[in-house]
């Protein structure tokens, strides 16, 4: 079974591109990363930074998660991200996404040993 840490990497990590290269980026990535298999995942964020830099966030600023849990952490520096949001004409299995690029601080939930990101909570 896929671990929570591996799932985070699959759903949120894209260090090889510095930003969404094309308008088709989200459509391709959401599909290739298997987030459109049984439904269209409505919103997803990809982080264009090294895995080491994102894992390091677990040891940065401790903040409350959206769900009230206390194991979330905010990055000290802004990171290159792409938000993929389902567009109005999207209907499973033909999921259609709109990409928005930004440089924002990310907030992730961390757990385990080693202590690594398992959930993308927000960007600010």
UniProtKB/Swiss-Prot annotation:
GO terms for biological process: defense response to Gram-positive bacterium. It is found in: Secreted. The gene is RNASE1. Substrate binds at residues 7, 10, 41-45, 66, 85. The active site is at residues 12, 119. CDD domains: RNase_A_canonical. Pfam families: RnaseA. It comes from Cervus elaphus. Keywords: Disulfide bond, Endonuclease, Hydrolase, Lyase, Nuclease, Secreted. Disulfide bonds join 26-84, 40-95, 58-110, 65-72. It comes from the Eukaryota. PANTHER family: RIBONUCLEASE, RIBONUCLEASE PANCREATIC. Its EC number is 4.6.1.18. Pancreas. This is Ribonuclease pancreatic. Signal peptide: none annotated. Monomer. Interacts with and forms tight 1:1 complexes with RNH1. Dimerization of two such complexes may occur. Interaction with RNH1 inhibits this protein. It catalyses: an [RNA] containing cytidine + H2O = an [RNA]-3'-cytidine-3'-phosphate + a 5'-hydroxy-ribonucleotide-3'-[RNA]; an [RNA] containing uridine + H2O = an [RNA]-3'-uridine-3'-phosphate + a 5'-hydroxy-ribonucleotide-3'-[RNA]. SMART domains: RNAse_Pc. The lineage of its organism: Eukaryota, Metazoa, Chordata, Craniata, Vertebrata. Residues 1-13 have a biased composition (Basic and acidic residues). GO terms for molecular function: lyase activity; nucleic acid binding; ribonuclease A activity. InterPro entries: RNaseA, RNaseA-like_dom_sf, RNaseA_AS, RNaseA_domain. Endonuclease that catalyzes the cleavage of RNA on the 3' side of pyrimidine nucleotides. Acts on single-stranded and double-stranded RNA. It is an enzyme of class 4 (lyase).
């Amino acid at each position: 079974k896929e671990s929570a840490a591996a799932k985070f990497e699959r759903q949120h990590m894209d260090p090889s591109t510095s930003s969404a290269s094309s308008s088709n980026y989200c459509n391709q990535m959401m599909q290739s990363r298997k987030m459109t298999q049984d439904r269209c995942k409505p919103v997803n964020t990809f982080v264009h930074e090294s895995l080491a830099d994102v894992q390091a966030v677990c040891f940065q600023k401790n903040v409350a998660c959206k769900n009230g849990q206390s194991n979330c952490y905010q990055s000290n520096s802004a990171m290159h991200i792409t938000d993929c949001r389902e567009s109005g004409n999207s209907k499973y299995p033909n999921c259609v996404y709109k990409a928005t690029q930004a440089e924002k601080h990310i907030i992730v939930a961390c757990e385990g040993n080693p202590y690594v990101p398992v959930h993308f909570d927000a960007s600010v």
